[in-house]
């Protein structure tokens, strides 16, 4: 039997939404192991002078709890 845990993680990028999600995985994996999935709750953009300046994502990261 496996037990999974879900945490909320916010990410951002100046490139794209995809890059923002990749940043979430990269940063979360520094403290969380066994990431199994990332669910994107919301996507936002920051705009200045009618141009997108930053892509933001609100995600739920699911990972398996292991006992070592």
Show the residue positions of the predicted features.
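Short, well-ordered alpha-helical segments
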Residues: 2-36
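Structural motif
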Residues: 4, 38, 56-58
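Noncatalytic linker/hinge segments flanking ATPase motor cores
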Residues: 24-25, 47-52
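Short, conserved loop-to-beta-strand elements that form functional interface hotspots
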Residues: 38-47
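C-terminal structural segments of small proteins and small subunits
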Residues: 50-68
């Amino acid at each position: 039997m496996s037990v999974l845990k879900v945490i909320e993680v916010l990410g951002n990028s100046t490139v794209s939404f995809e890059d923002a999600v990749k940043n979430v995985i990269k940063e979360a994996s520094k403290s969380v192991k066994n990431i199994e999935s990332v669910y994107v709750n919301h996507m936002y953009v920051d705009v200045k002078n009618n141009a997108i300046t930053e892509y933001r994502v609100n995600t739920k990261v699911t990972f398996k709890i292991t006992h070592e």
